[in-house]
Amino acid sequence: MNLLDPFMKMTDEQEKGLSGAPSPTMSEDSAGSPCPSGSGSDTENTRPQENTFPKGEPDLKKESEEDKFPVCIREAVSQVLKGYDWTLVPMPVRVNGSSKNKPHVKRPMNAFMVWAQAARRKLADQYPHLHNAELSKTLGKLWRLLNESEKRPFVEEAERLRVQHKKDHPDYKYQPRRRKSVKNGQAEAEEATEQTHISPNAIFKALQADSPHSSSGMSEVHSPGEHSGQSQGPPTPPTTPKTDVQPGKADLKREGRPLPEGGRQPPIDFRDVDIGELSSDVISNIETFDVNEFDQYLPPNGHPGVPATHGQVTYTGSYGISSTAATPAGAGHVWMSKQQAPPPPPQQPPQAPPAPQAPPQPQAAPPQQPAAPPQQPQAHTLTTLSSEPGQSQRTHIKTEQLSPSHYSEQQQHSPQQIAYSPFNLPHYSPSYPPITRSQYDYTDHQNSSSYYSHAAGQGTGLYSTFTYMNPAQRPMYTPIADTSGVPSIPQTHSPQHWEQPVYTQLTRP
């Protein structure tokens, strides 16, 4: 019985807070019940002067433990039981509008249900302000605290009901009602269709969340308002994720898609995405990217499991911030088609462009200086390419994927790189290929052997394609010099004059 004391005191205080009930030490079940207080543990231990039975009579106490509930609950409940026709409970209730002709037969109540229903009636009459859910919780807690002797009357009542139920419905078999599955099926179908089309906003927000600025602000991305029609079920509550969470997993949670095995995020298929829709979001939010720290989220070899020839698609998918920012929709495919069959005019020897350039010593210049004169990166690009003519085309693909950290530099240096960069497909992320710091600065990121080890067998490919890069062809891949975001008029100047245009479009402050 003493088990109950702390709980009774707790419910007391609750009750004082809720109703200011006049009887402070009686539990909510009996306070206000008209019965004389039986020798329940609470009143017994705290207010002995109110008890009808003296505290020192163990026989009476034992008898009351078996027959009475603490704090007069038993008496209150028995009053309810007397006045309540329990045979009504299991009787068939006709289901309106149901296709079945058979009425639904409820299960017989178990002991807890008997207790809860009776006590709820009593308490609801006494404390109409009590919230039903709170009442249920309290009744459940009290039931768990009762000992066997206290539960016995309810167990017996439940047994009686069960026997009665069996007489009334001899062939009764419990069949839980099936939930109507129509809505669930529709919802699943909708989710399936939603997952096939990924809205550009969702992609951009997923990318933005990888930026270090929003690592603590990732909760903004998952906040319910920002789920752009993709979350299944209730939106994820905003949480501040652990810093060591894998970015792939975070993206997937944010985009509401199930995580495949291994936790790796599959590359987004951009055929379904209108790249033009991205640009406004990207331009307005481009300041939030911390260019230099962005590399830490990258796998060492670009996207695992993606063939290198898909570099353009993958690149715009995962880091398409800069390249898609200023492009009209579909530009990427135009560039790809041009590149796939490059006309091979061999007028110029392979080494011709690098000849007048500066020596490659500035290669070790820190990449954090986006304001370096554009002529330098041009020199780096050329010397890198010409001094390693035996290396493969893949080299530069991988380099591009390895460091998408050049968002700010790209706008300033892209013209020079464009002149010599279109070696193969992946460089045509729309409107200008972003080969920037990672090419002339590859020594900062990894030793160069890792770049060239995976593509040793294709030396001639680089060498031959390099011949196509004569000045006559350069205008085909002109950078964006105007601010409209459309590829501008071909510029036939020599590379030295390409520094003039001022690229104010997306540079960070």
Swiss-Prot record:
UniProt-annotated stretches for the region PQA: 63-103
Compositional bias (Pro residues): 341-376
UniProt-recorded Gene Ontology molecular function terms: chromatin binding; cis-regulatory region sequence-specific DNA binding; DNA binding; DNA-binding transcription activator activity, RNA polymerase II-specific; DNA-binding transcription factor activity, RNA polymerase II-specific; RNA polymerase II cis-regulatory region sequence-specific DNA binding; sequence-specific DNA binding
InterPro entries linked: HMG_box_dom, HMG_box_dom_sf, Sox_N, SOX_TF
Annotated stretches, region: Transactivation domain (TAM): 224-307
UniProt region (Transactivation domain (TAC)), positions on chain: 394-509
Composition skew (Low complexity), residue ranges: 30-41
Motif (9aaTAD 3): 460-468
Keywords (A to Z) from UniProt: Acetylation, Activator, Differentiation, DNA-binding, Isopeptide bond, Nucleus, Phosphoprotein, Transcription, Transcription regulation, Ubl conjugation
Modification type Phosphoserine: residues: 64, 211
Modification comment: Acetylated; acetylation impairs nuclear localization and ability to transactivate expression of target genes. Deacetylated by SIRT1. Phosphorylation at Ser-64 and Ser-211 by PKA increases transcriptional activity and may help delay chondrocyte maturation downstream of PTHLH/PTHrP signaling. Phosphorylation at either Ser-64 or Ser-211 is required for sumoylation, but phosphorylation is not dependent on sumoylation. Phosphorylated on tyrosine residues; tyrosine dephosphorylation by PTPN11/SHP2 blocks SOX9 phosphorylation by PKA and subsequent SUMOylation.
Motif (9aaTAD 2): 290-298
Glycyl lysine isopeptide (Lys-Gly) (interchain with G-Cter in ubiquitin) crosslink residues: 398
Region called Dimerization (DIM), residue ranges: 63-103
Positions occupied by motif 9aaTAD 1: 275-284
Record region (Disordered): 1-67, 160-273, 334-415, 479-509
Pfam families according to UniProt: HMG_box (PF00505), Sox_N (PF12444)
Biased composition (Basic and acidic residues): 56-67, 160-174
Localization in the cell: Nucleus
Polar residues composition-biased segments: 42-52, 380-415, 485-509
Gene3D superfamilies in alphabetical order: High mobility group box domain (1.10.30.10)
Role: Transcription factor that plays a key role in chondrocytes differentiation and skeletal development. Specifically binds the 5'-ACAAAG-3' DNA motif present in enhancers and super-enhancers and promotes expression of genes important for chondrogenesis, including cartilage matrix protein-coding genes COL2A1, COL4A2, COL9A1, COL11A2 and ACAN, SOX5 and SOX6. Also binds to some promoter regions. Plays a central role in successive steps of chondrocyte differentiation.
Assembly mode: Homodimer; homodimerization is required for activity. Interacts (via C-terminus) with ZNF219; forming a complex that binds to the COL2A1 promoter and activates COL2A1 expression. Interacts with DDRGK1. Interacts with EP300/p300. Interacts with beta-catenin (CTNNB1); inhibiting CTNNB1 activity by competing with the binding sites of TCF/LEF within CTNNB1.
Comment, domains: The transactivation domains TAM and TAC (for transactivation domain in the middle and at the C-terminus, respectively) are required to contact transcriptional coactivators and basal transcriptional machinery components and thereby induce gene transactivation.
Protein name: Transcription factor SOX-9
Native source organism of the sequence: Callithrix jacchus (White-tufted-ear marmoset)
Gene responsible for this protein: SOX9
